[in-house]
A protein has these predicted regions:
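N-terminal beta1-alpha1 ligand-phosphate binding loop
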Residues: 4-19
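Short glycine-aspartate micro-motif
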Residues: 4-8, 56-60, 105, 129-133
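Short glycine-rich anion-binding loops that position phosphate/pyrophosphate groups of nucleotides
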Residues: 12, 64-67, 135-137
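Hydrophobic "anchor" residues
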Residues: 13, 25, 74, 79, ...
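Glycine/GP-enriched mid-protein hinge/lid loop-to-helix segment characteristic of carbohydrate kinases
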Residues: 17-21, 27-30, 37, 105, ...
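N-terminal phosphate-binding loop and adjacent alpha-helix
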Residues: 22-55, 73
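Glycine-rich phosphate-binding loop and adjoining helix at the ATP-binding site
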Residues: 34, 40, 58, 65-128, ...
């Protein structure tokens, strides 16, 4: 049976899994998101410790962002200008793929969740399928014609600017890039 590795790279925690399908989980772990070196080291350690018993044929990574998903970009696979301290310009895709010597693919955390709901959860039969999340951040992912939305049409919902009455509420927002976007005011 073919086994796959999965990484949910979240702003507060990482979850790693080895499975053949959603209801056949062979190994799983979770740990807090700290520094890139420590956190990615724990990811690599989990898969290497389990590689003899549960060898994976590929790795899927859903990651907080923003992430560069343009395969022609020199920073493809990187977490880019994230407000998460210490994580900006982290090459998560190649660091994990190279260390584990396995093919890997990366998408946004919300697209990963949207795809999971579309294939196995509440989004089955819905196309397009939209997934909204409020957690460490605010975001959304979308599936159209069975594929995640990328590029200029990707819905960075957490960073949409909101109408803001500066007289009633002078708070400028905490987002270092947009100030009073949805996430910056939450």
């Amino acid at each position: 049976m073919t086994l796959f590795g999965g990484v949910e790279a979240g702003g507060t925690k990482f979850v790693c899994i080895i499975a053949s399908k959603p209801d056949d989980i062979r190994a799983e772990t979770r740990f807090p998101t700290t520094t890139p070196a420590e956190t990615l080291g724990r990811v690599i350690d989990f898969f290497q410790r389990n590689s003899r018993r549960y060898p994976i044929s590929a790795l899927g990574i859903s990651c907080f962002g923003p992430v560069d998903l343009d395969t022609s970009s020199p920073t493809y696979g990187y977490i880019t200008t994230t407000p998460k301290p210490g994580w900006a310009q982290t090459d998560i895709l190649h660091r994990l793929s190279d260390a584990l010597k396995t093919p890997a693919i990366l998408d946004t955390d919300v697209n990963g969740a949207a795809l999971g709901e579309y294939r196995w959860g509440a989004g089955q039969g819905a196309d397009p399928c939209l997934y909204l999340t409020i957690g460490t951040g605010i975001g959304g992912g979308g599936i159209v014609n069975g594929k995640p939305i990328h590029g200029l049409v990707h819905p960075e919902m957490g960073h949409m600017r909101l109408p803001h009455d500066w007289q009633a509420d002078p708070f400028p927002g905490w987002c270092p890039y947009h100030g009073d976007c949805f996430e910056g005011l939450a």
